[in-house]
Amino acid sequence: MKNTKTVLILAAVTGALLLGGCGSEKTKTYEQAGKDLSQGSYKYALEEYQSSIQNGVKLAQSYRGAGIASLRLGKYEDAVNNFTEALNCDNVSKNLRKDILSYRATEELKWGKYEDAMADCQTLGEDFSMDASSYFLTGKVALAMDSYEEAASNFKQAYGEDATYDMAIQIYEAYLDKDMEADGTRYLEAALSS
């Protein structure tokens, strides 16, 4: 009887250690994916995030990571799908939701899905407080849609929130891409005169 209890306790402890080891290994894969993503190893990061998704590890964050890796690899449709899956996960924090929406809008812009990108920008404006990055992204999408006044308004807000040389360069480059260099030059001049 005493031996049976000992065997059962040892079996339970061994089982817990083995299961704990599996969870630890799954977490290590997720953490390695983050490292690979930050180091520019997008292919490896994508594979590791996909493994984390299959294992149910931090689903929203894993889908987000897979989306970013896909974005960097130029797999636009996959990126949008991953960002959408991330948004559909349970218990997505407000900050993470804003981050994912911003990434998805950026991806949709690159993919040429301007209406979808603008819809995400509008959701950002309705559900979250806008910051310089949000205004800039919305301006860039509006510019791509040839909504010049809306773009100008958003760029003005972006520069008002972040009147730095970097923001001026970003706005200038957005206008330059649309052959509207003169519109962007005023931001460069303002940054240089500060």
Language-model regions, residue ranges each:
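Canonical tetratricopeptide repeat
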Residues: G65, L96-Y103, L137, Q170-I171
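Start-of-helix register in tetratricopeptide repeats
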Residues: T27-K28, Q61, N95-D99, S133, ...
